[in-house]
């Protein structure tokens, strides 16, 4: 006999068989399961605890998987996974061979669209709604998007497009940054039921039809309706986009959610439902500090997440300390982040230099062009951005920064593999797409101290420059307190050997040094991907039988390709082995294990080099 309601749910069909009165009890069970599950695996907790009731209501009302639900970003999709046959698989969440932390089309028919980056859901759901229209299907498409993701321009581009259609698209705004008083909440819950009801919709259409013969009167009536709704709801903006706005409603009241969604399901045209939720709902530590519990490692639910112990600083912390030190030295410095203050190490800077700190929201394109405008007038911007999110601002980097040779520093965090977050968040491609941009200096530090020095080099350079560094801690190198730069385009030889020269970039210098001890190989810390150290490459090519390039980036178009191109330009013929990330998307898992699986740990490097050496003619 099942011990709980949750044990009876293997699919949304089982959920829809329950009486609505049992949903609150199921929500409590799901919440308890989430806390225990994420405590054992790590993952996103606060956002998932806040979306339990909303997820239950959506699957209860809509005929999934026939109807499509697109989860923006996707880190709030754990309840969705639990309800769609993956409850037992949650024990392997974000681990190698286990289920992903984000929706994946290849993982389940219920995952309508793969996500990981923000603000894509409305565009994708609109495309699905149009496809259903083209195919003559009555299927429905729903986009669930958070308030943070609504800061991105792409979301508004999609709203603008959708509002001009008559497609039955539903956009659900999961607003966990808005407080709602009991009185206003009760009023809005009532109005939501009214505005989503068939009578209201029918009366609205009939009135519009009657007044169509008198456009001035119709416009007056429309404005009067917007004024009345605007007195108690904040939805005028979405009405202007052409949506029927409903809400805000309590996102933890299942009765209100289910009834409102049932009404909306039968409405014509684009609908916008504003739902207010609380991050960390049901787990006091997460409610108190949702930022700390946004993404967590394994923890004891009874004790909560432990603060980080003192130890080796992460590259992110090295950057944050450097930024504050350089800001104290140069009053022209400003720091910019696209909604990643904590993740990019800008907390201390934001506190010590609040007038020089800019969080522009999830708006990477704007962040770079904003930086370009600052640089035009003599300010020195530093943009702290994840490698994977820099992809979204590629045109701005080329057109607005590099083309004008503006002194903007890009501090590129999470370069290379990122472990449990998987391919949507990996920084596998930045060297490949950056090194073809004219006038852009690209550096990759091998340890914490070199990271600090290369950041100073980039900042003091009179042109665009990028420093890319990995997630996590470095080698434990002693960090010098100064702000001295290094010479641009010059590497350093770390070890002298024979036959083989390992040209290592960034994070792979350390495993290269370990492998070199067994191979008796030369190791060069190249430091710069662009410009390359021409003299060093030529010297190493002249004195070794085999050159091996090492990078935590895609081999295609990466640093190794740059070395091969340089050798061709110089007319030097020497065997080159390029080691890096192969031409596949690297799945989620422990970062060190994934690097080893790619053959980029010391044993893997030794093995690959030995095999190539053995194949060379004597």
Curated annotation (Swiss-Prot):
**Which Pfam families would you find in this protein's record?**
DXP_synthase_N, Transket_pyr, Transketolase_C
List the keywords (alphabetical): Isoprene biosynthesis, Magnesium, Metal-binding, Thiamine biosynthesis, Thiamine pyrophosphate, Transferase
**Which segments does the entry list as coiled coil?**
none
Q: Which SUPFAM superfamilies is this protein grouped with?
A: Thiamin diphosphate-binding fold (THDP-binding) (SSF52518), TK C-terminal domain-like (SSF52922)
Q: Which GO terms describe its molecular function?
A: 1-deoxy-D-xylulose-5-phosphate synthase activity; magnesium ion binding; thiamine pyrophosphate binding
Q: How is the cofactor bound?
A: Binds 1 Mg(2+) ion per subunit.
| Annotated positions binding Mg(2+) | 147, 176
Pathway where it operates: Metabolic intermediate biosynthesis; 1-deoxy-D-xylulose 5-phosphate biosynthesis; 1-deoxy-D-xylulose 5-phosphate from D-glyceraldehyde 3-phosphate and pyruvate: step 1/1
* InterPro entries hit by this protein: Dxylulose-5-P_synthase, THDP-binding, Transketo_C/PFOR_II, Transketolase-like_Pyr-bd, Transketolase_BS, Transketolase_C, Transketolase_CS
Give the catalysed reaction(s), semicolon-separated. D-glyceraldehyde 3-phosphate + pyruvate + H(+) = 1-deoxy-D-xylulose 5-phosphate + CO2
An annotated GO BP: isopentenyl diphosphate biosynthetic process, methylerythritol 4-phosphate pathway
Q: What cofactor does this one take?
A: Mg(2+); thiamine diphosphate
Instruction: Summarize where thiamine diphosphate binds, as residue positions.
Output: 75, 116-118, 148-149, 176, 283, 364
| Function (record text) | Catalyzes the acyloin condensation reaction between C atoms 2 and 3 of pyruvate and glyceraldehyde 3-phosphate to yield 1-deoxy-D-xylulose-5-phosphate (DXP).
Protein name, per record: 1-deoxy-D-xylulose-5-phosphate synthase
Originating gene: dxs
């Amino acid at each position: 006999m099942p011990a709980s309601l949750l044990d009876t749910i293997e699919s949304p069909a089982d959920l829809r068989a329950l009486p609505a009165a049992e949903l609150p009890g199921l929500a409590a069970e799901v919440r308890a399961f989430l806390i225990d599950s994420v405590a054992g695996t790590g993952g996103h907790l606060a956002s998932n605890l806040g979306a339990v009731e909303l997820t239950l209501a959506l699957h209860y009302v809509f005929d999934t998987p026939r109807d499509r639900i697109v989860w923006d970003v996707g880190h709030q999709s754990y309840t969705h996974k639990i309800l769609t046959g993956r409850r037992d698989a949650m024990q392997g969440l974000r681990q190698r061979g286990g289920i992903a932390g984000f929706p994946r089309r290849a993982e389940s028919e219920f995952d309508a669209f793969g996500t990981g980056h923000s603000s894509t859901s409305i565009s994708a759901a609109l495309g699905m709604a149009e496809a259903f229209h083209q195919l003559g299907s009555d299927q429905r498409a729903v986009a669930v998007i958070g308030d943070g993701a609504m800061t991105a321009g792409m979301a508004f581009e999609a709203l603008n497009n959708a509002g001009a259609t008559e497609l039955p698209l539903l956009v659900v705004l999961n607003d966990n940054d808005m407080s709602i008083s009991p009185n206003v909440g009760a009023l809005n819950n009532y109005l939501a039921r009214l505005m989503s009801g068939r009578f209201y919709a029918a009366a609205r259409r009939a009135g519009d039809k009657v007044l169509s013969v008198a456009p001035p009167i119709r416009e007056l009536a429309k404005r009067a309706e917007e004024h009345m709704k605007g007195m108690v709801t904040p939805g005028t903006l979405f009405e202007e986009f052409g949506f029927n706005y409903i809400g805000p409603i309590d996102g933890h009241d299942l009765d209100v959610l289910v009834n409102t969604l049932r009404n909306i399901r039968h409405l014509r045209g684009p609908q916008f439902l504003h739902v207010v939720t609380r991050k960390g709902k049901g787990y006091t530590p997460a409610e108190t500090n949702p930022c700390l519990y946004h993404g967590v490692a394994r923890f004891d639910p009874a004790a909560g997440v432990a603060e980080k112990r003192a130890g080796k600083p992460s590259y992110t912390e090295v950057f944050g300390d450097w930024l504050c030190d350089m800001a104290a030295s140069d009053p022209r410095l400003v720091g910019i982040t696209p909604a990643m203050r904590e993740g990019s190490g800008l907390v201390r800077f934001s506190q010590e230099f609040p007038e020089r700190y800019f969080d522009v929201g999830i708006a990477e394109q704007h962040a770079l062009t904003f930086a370009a405008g600052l640089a035009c007038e003599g300010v020195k911007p530093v943009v702290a951005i994840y490698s994977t999110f820099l992809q979204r601002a590629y045109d701005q980097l080329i057109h607005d920064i590099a083309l004008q040779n503006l002194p903007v520093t890009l501090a590129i965090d999470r370069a290379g593999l990122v472990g449990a977050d998987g391919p949507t968040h990996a920084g596998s491609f930045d060297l490949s797409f950056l090194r073809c941009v004219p006038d852009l200096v690209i550096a990759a530090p091998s340890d914490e101290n070199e990271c600090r020095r290369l950041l100073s080099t980039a900042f003091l350079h009179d042109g665009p420059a990028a420093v890319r560094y990995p997630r996590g801690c470095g080698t434990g190198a002693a960090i010098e307190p100064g702000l001295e730069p290094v010479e641009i385009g010059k590497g350093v030889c770390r070890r002298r050997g024979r036959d083989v020269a390992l040209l290592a970039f960034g994070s792979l210098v350390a495993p290269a040094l370990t492998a070199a001890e067994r191979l008796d190989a030369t190791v060069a810390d190249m430091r710069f991907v662009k410009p390359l150290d021409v003299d060093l490459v030529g010297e190493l090519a002249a004195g070794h039988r085999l050159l091996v390039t090492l990078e935590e980036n895609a081999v295609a178009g990466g640093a190794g390709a740059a070395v091969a191109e340089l050798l061709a330009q110089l007319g030097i013929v020497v065997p080159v082995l390029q080691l890096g990330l192969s031409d596949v998307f690297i799945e989620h898992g422990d970062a060190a294990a994934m690097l080893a699986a790619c053959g980029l740990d010391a044993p893997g490097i030794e093995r690959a080099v030995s095999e190539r050496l053995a194949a060379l003619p004597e």
